[in-house]
Amino acid sequence: MTKYVFVTGGVVSSLGKGIAAASLAAILESRGLKVTLLKLDPYINVDPGTMSPFQHGEVFVTEDGAETDLDLGHYERFISTKMRKANNFTTGQIYESVIRKERRGDYLGKTVQVIPHITNEIQAFIERGAASATCGEPDVAIVEIGGTVGDIESLPFLEAARQMSLRLGRNSACFVHLTLVPYVATAGELKTKPTQHSVQKLREIGILPHVLLCRADRRIPDDESKKISMFSNVPEDAVISVWDADSIYKIPQMLHDQGLDRIICEELKLSPKDADLTMWSELVEKLENPKHEVTIGMVGKYVDLTESYKSLIEALRHASLHTSTKVNIEYIDSEEIETNGVDSLKHLDAVLVPGGFGRRGTEGKIAAIRYAREAKVPYLGICLGMQLAVIEFARNVVGLKQANSTEFEPDTPERVVALITEWYDRDGKVETRTEESDLGGTMRLGSQRCPIKPGTMAEEIYGKDVNERHRHRYEVNNRFVPQLEAGGLIISARTPSEDLPEMMELPRSMHPWFVGVQFHPEFTSTPRDGHPLFKSFVEAALANKQARGV
């Protein structure tokens, strides 16, 4: 039978519940347990697909095509279990399901209320998510509840967790509470009152945490831990200090050294083998002792909030691990390039243009791509970055001066990138979409395997085929491909069913390393294995730096 660990947060958001939950999962997995994770988001949106990256951060896409919270990316990077749509749900999905049942008559005329109907539905979603784990029936399901204790939006989720713990019985569920212990510089000390009040809030709704994870900018002294223990009614050894680290991959060892996994296993009456965190210590060793160093420029419009590119940043870090190369990322605002030109790019070893939506900043990205192509600087374009690379090539090499995407210029005569009007859904039916279709849930999403053209750089990187995740509604227009290929551009991978361009590259006779991909390879990169595309990109950046004698 699956046992549950509920992870809650207090005082403020963005303390790192997702990293803490993923780190605990990594330790338990190293002890031989089958582990899955779920993220419960209290917002009313059905999914984060149409939310601004400035508000929500990155949207992580699962293999089965779900648009989910970025914490699911952390989960996949820390454990071997792949996430699915059922691993993330929102208040919007819960209410949508309950209202659908009410309309269908499932409640037999009863008054539908938050308790019991909403809370019962939350419990059903949790158990369904755990049961659908790709690892088989998990020994432990770690459930991260978004928001903070005291938020009105989180109350139904906390109440559902309390009810579920009571229903499952002793030693079947436990609670881990992550809270802030701020350092007040004027007083010269850590303050425990916010943590005490946060735990009191939790106890008011009937939840007594078994473990406190105390976030601070430094290790919490023993006397402060004793104070927290006494006022929170949590055993002293279960008050665990979680201080700022320069790498998230140090957190599993930090938590294990303080006995978090032992406490959880004792509470849930589990007797697994001892933890083996050798892999994590080796990763940290590689991170801290690189042999080389490169600087890669990431040109985008969300550069002020790096959470928007969380998986991409981590994928570059993974590549640094597997190439013994420290990767410095410079975030460059594409709108500044539109104003000031490309001088800010001239010291870079490589240029990367990530995915994005909307017209703002696109001409700056195109200028950056042109610079990378003409200066022979390694270039990687992801999703929109590939589309803009094709537009740049069409304008400046092929001579299609009005080449553009209908996303930015609906009336452009040279629609090099256009909306895919006919899509195949998962049942194989054709669905026609237009520019007026709803935005939510209307993208090409999830994994798709594609054959790769022999003799290309793509084949050197991936092999005979590529299986990556997608999130887009625009594609390179096949009508212009013959002209692009006549100019030298290579379409190196296509979808087998719709024949859509998936990868493009320039031959080495034109450029040493210039690749665009319509998919999002960053979603499948892990610290354990890295990713072949990002490893090749970092190696190309290093070769460029060495060739320049820098």
From Swiss-Prot:
<feature type="binding site">
    <location>
        <position position="407"/>
    </location>
    <ligand>
        <name>L-glutamine</name>
    </ligand>
</feature>
<feature type="binding site">
    <location>
        <begin position="191"/>
        <end position="196"/>
    </location>
    <ligand>
        <name>UTP</name>
    </ligand>
</feature>
<keyword id="KW-0436">Ligase</keyword>
<comment type="function">
    <text>Catalyzes the ATP-dependent amination of UTP to CTP with either L-glutamine or ammonia as the source of nitrogen. Regulates intracellular CTP levels through interactions with the four ribonucleotide triphosphates.</text>
</comment>
<keyword id="KW-0547">Nucleotide-binding</keyword>
<feature type="binding site">
    <location>
        <position position="71"/>
    </location>
    <ligand>
        <name>ATP</name>
    </ligand>
</feature>
<dbReference type="GO" id="GO:0044210">
    <property type="term" value="P:'de novo' CTP biosynthetic process"/>
</dbReference>
<dbReference type="GO" id="GO:0004359">
    <property type="term" value="F:glutaminase activity"/>
</dbReference>
<feature type="domain" description="Glutamine amidotransferase type-1">
    <location>
        <begin position="295"/>
        <end position="547"/>
    </location>
</feature>
<dbReference type="InterPro" id="IPR029062">
    <property type="entry name" value="Class_I_gatase-like"/>
</dbReference>
<comment type="pathway">
    <text>Pyrimidine metabolism; CTP biosynthesis via de novo pathway; CTP from UDP: step 2/2.</text>
</comment>
<feature type="binding site">
    <location>
        <position position="71"/>
    </location>
    <ligand>
        <name>Mg(2+)</name>
    </ligand>
</feature>
<feature type="binding site">
    <location>
        <begin position="14"/>
        <end position="19"/>
    </location>
    <ligand>
        <name>ATP</name>
    </ligand>
</feature>
<dbReference type="Pfam" id="PF00117">
    <property type="entry name" value="GATase"/>
</dbReference>
<keyword id="KW-0479">Metal-binding</keyword>
<dbReference type="GO" id="GO:0005829">
    <property type="term" value="C:cytosol"/>
</dbReference>
<protein>
    <recommendedName>
        <fullName>CTP synthase</fullName>
        <ecNumber>6.3.4.2</ecNumber>
    </recommendedName>
</protein>
<feature type="active site" description="Nucleophile; for glutamine hydrolysis">
    <location>
        <position position="383"/>
    </location>
</feature>
<dbReference type="InterPro" id="IPR017926">
    <property type="entry name" value="GATASE"/>
</dbReference>
<dbReference type="GO" id="GO:0003883">
    <property type="term" value="F:CTP synthase activity"/>
</dbReference>
<feature type="binding site">
    <location>
        <begin position="191"/>
        <end position="196"/>
    </location>
    <ligand>
        <name>CTP</name>
    </ligand>
</feature>
<keyword id="KW-0315">Glutamine amidotransferase</keyword>
<dbReference type="InterPro" id="IPR017456">
    <property type="entry name" value="CTP_synthase_N"/>
</dbReference>
<feature type="binding site">
    <location>
        <position position="227"/>
    </location>
    <ligand>
        <name>CTP</name>
    </ligand>
</feature>
<feature type="binding site">
    <location>
        <position position="227"/>
    </location>
    <ligand>
        <name>UTP</name>
    </ligand>
</feature>
<dbReference type="GO" id="GO:0046872">
    <property type="term" value="F:metal ion binding"/>
</dbReference>
<dbReference type="InterPro" id="IPR033828">
    <property type="entry name" value="GATase1_CTP_Synthase"/>
</dbReference>
<dbReference type="GO" id="GO:0042802">
    <property type="term" value="F:identical protein binding"/>
</dbReference>
<feature type="binding site">
    <location>
        <begin position="384"/>
        <end position="387"/>
    </location>
    <ligand>
        <name>L-glutamine</name>
    </ligand>
</feature>
<dbReference type="GO" id="GO:0005524">
    <property type="term" value="F:ATP binding"/>
</dbReference>
<feature type="binding site">
    <location>
        <position position="13"/>
    </location>
    <ligand>
        <name>CTP</name>
    </ligand>
</feature>
<feature type="active site">
    <location>
        <position position="522"/>
    </location>
</feature>
<comment type="subunit">
    <text>Homotetramer.</text>
</comment>
<feature type="active site">
    <location>
        <position position="520"/>
    </location>
</feature>
<feature type="binding site">
    <location>
        <position position="356"/>
    </location>
    <ligand>
        <name>L-glutamine</name>
    </ligand>
</feature>
<feature type="binding site">
    <location>
        <position position="144"/>
    </location>
    <ligand>
        <name>Mg(2+)</name>
    </ligand>
</feature>
<dbReference type="InterPro" id="IPR027417">
    <property type="entry name" value="P-loop_NTPase"/>
</dbReference>
<keyword id="KW-0665">Pyrimidine biosynthesis</keyword>
<feature type="region of interest" description="Amidoligase domain">
    <location>
        <begin position="1"/>
        <end position="270"/>
    </location>
</feature>
<dbReference type="Pfam" id="PF06418">
    <property type="entry name" value="CTP_synth_N"/>
</dbReference>
<keyword id="KW-0460">Magnesium</keyword>
<dbReference type="InterPro" id="IPR004468">
    <property type="entry name" value="CTP_synthase"/>
</dbReference>
